[in-house]
Amino acid sequence: MGAFTFKHSFFGSFVECSGVLQTVFIFLLIPCCLADKRAPPLIPNVPLLWVWNAPTEFCIGGTNQPLDMSFFSIVGTPRKNITGQSITLYYVDRLGYYPYIDPHTGAIVHGGLPQLMNLQQHLRKSRQDILFYMPTDSVGLAVIDWEEWRPTWTRNWRPKDIYRNKSIELVKSQHPQYNHSYAVAVAKRDFERTGKAFMLETLKLGKSLRPSSLWGYYLFPDCYNTHFTKPNYDGHCPPIELQRNNDLQWLWNDSTALYPSVYLTSRVRSSQNGALYVRNRVHESIRVSKLMDDKNPLPIYVYIRLVFTDQTTTFLELDDLVHSVGEIVPLGVSGIIIWGSLSLTRSLVSCIGLENYMKGTLLPYLINVTLAAKMCGQVLCKNQGICTRKDWNTNTYLHLNATNFDIELQQNGKFVVHGKPSLEDLQEFSKNFHCSCYTNVACKDRLDVHNVRSVNVCTANNICIDAVLNFPSLDDDDEPPITDDTSQNQDSISDITSSAPPSSHILPKDLSWCLFLLSIFSQHWKYLL
């Protein structure tokens, strides 16, 4: 999988502070380290939820059998009129009377503008649609996919500026005495007020009717970091977009999940720019998830595609999976949703091509990162949280060590992983990652990984690590083994760990980034005395 480097923080004049001040600052900063919370898993013992949301239900593979989707905890199709799924995707024609202007024909649908559609009429129809697509209240994901206009006026740039132009025309037709500047201001106010009402009241209705599902809007939050052609692209989200996301606090307050998207274009194929793009978008989603309450963050389910957005018949290569999935997992999200269109399943040939891609490239990699992440969470967090990067903006990945492990596709079509982790593998976890504890759980990083005596973790379809470890013991206070409940009564035996190389510059404890902050304080403390 290639070598991945780890960037480390350079410490400045930390020694300028007295020992007492260092101690005081450390104690002040420790709570900020321990406050890095994540939402608990939707399904117990499934810290990383894999969701398949593509129309493959009629696909037949090379063995004349349906595609094997057993790896995914939730499988659903975005086809219309399919009801009672664990993931429900509401397009513009499936939830109420969403007002928009058809981007292809220019046709006005339901008034075209939120100012011109009766909200109560929309909500009555939305109620019917929710009860139709979700006949029972069960645990699942409810995603509203409204992309035609954005609730933030300024973000409706070309070609969505038609909503701004039509809104201005509406105000001028109603109030011809207004000058242009005032008409624009009124149009902005009216558009944002009614757009907010449409999105917010629809969200509240969904939560009231089906409270067990996690409700949110697809592509929210976004950070518009697609400036790939700029020199020295680093993937950062423009500061103005962070502020605009802050201004959507009303939306985050009533969402029960976030559904950002990190679809890749061929412009970043096999390029580090793809990793930077994904990394920063996910990091912004994590920031937004904590705006309302950093101790009770919203769960985040990231949408990905298996193909490029501008080349819908070209599958992502392994490098691109590393730059997407590989970036998402160590940042610490609740799950990943794989979305696909009919282009994946338009013929028998395309179905067989998808099956071959899944068996040869996709599933081995997903198994890799899933078990690595779960093992890290068990070893370092005792299953009370998930492993996340100590420094989010580095190339450290939760991968198996290719020297110690091998994922094999057996003749029966099932995967098995051979090998077991070395002490060095577990030490890599401790060097590069720390625990982000689940909400309302007090956990801390395990530092004595040499005392780990066994690992036991599984994927949802029971591809398991069940290994007894025989590391030299440095202490007599060995702890009992930690087990994964999902591995009970399973026959598969496998092992996995991280592939990030060791670095002598990484601090041996999980306070490295806090100490970095401390170093900043130390450099400026003398000016405060």
Curated annotation (Swiss-Prot):
It catalyses: Random hydrolysis of (1->4)-linkages between N-acetyl-beta-D-glucosamine and D-glucuronate residues in hyaluronate. Its main location: membrane. The active site is at 147 (proton donor). A lipid is attached at residue 492 (GPI-anchor amidated serine). Glycans are attached at residues 81, 165, 179, 253, 368, 401. It comes from Cavia porcellus. One of its GO terms (biological process) is fusion of sperm to egg plasma membrane involved in single fertilization. This is Hyaluronidase PH-20. Pfam families: Glyco_hydro_56. Residues 487-502 have a biased composition (Polar residues). Endoproteolysis (toward the C-terminus producing two disulfide-linked fragments) could activate PH-20. Residues 1-35 form the signal peptide. Transmembrane segments: none annotated. Belongs to the glycosyl hydrolase 56 family. Testis. Residues 478-502 are annotated as: Disordered. Involved in sperm-egg adhesion. Upon fertilization sperm must first penetrate a layer of cumulus cells that surrounds the egg before reaching the zona pellucida. The cumulus cells are embedded in a matrix containing hyaluronic acid which is formed prior to ovulation. This protein aids in penetrating the layer of cumulus cells by digesting hyaluronic acid. Disulfide bonds join 59-351, 223-237, 376-387, 381-435, 437-464. It is found in: Cell membrane. Keywords: Cell adhesion, Cell membrane, Disulfide bond, Glycoprotein, Glycosidase, GPI-anchor, Hydrolase, Lipoprotein, Membrane, Signal. Gene3D superfamilies: Aldolase class I. It is a lipid-anchor; GPI-anchor. Its EC number is 3.2.1.35. GO terms for cellular component: acrosomal vesicle; plasma membrane; side of membrane. Residues 493-529 form a propeptide.
